[in-house]
Amino acid sequence: MKTGWYNDNNVFLVVKPLHNGNRQSLIVGAQQLATNKWNIFMGVFPSNATYNSVMHSSVWMAPTSTNKKPTAKNLFLALEALDEIEQEIYNRANGEAAIIYIDGIDERSLRVYTKVLTKKRGYRESLIKSEYVSNMQKLYKMI
């Protein structure tokens, strides 16, 4: 998928290439569930992945359900968060793609909490906290 913002049938995806030269893209998205909750997820996908393959790769979706509709603002915040923890993701994944999902977003303090689940470690969850200051505040005002 190309870098950008996708919106199709109440599914929102933001796609961004990773900087590791492995032809992978980081995708963060949200899907409305039948219960009117939102399934918010992130994952590392091959750059040639299609919209349908992302949406049908259930193994990649580790949900955090929320009643709050996701906004472009908080999805972009979550995506930017991964810039700061990208290396940590690869360290924990031992070279394999990690599954990441949003555990919580605190827009006032511009923090995004994510959980990383790695295949080689049996999907053991670990919490990573990422905090930002100036660049995130600029982004926050722009969106």
PLM segments and residue spans:
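Non-catalytic substrate-recognition and accessory regions of acyl/acetyltransferase enzymes
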Residues: 1-143
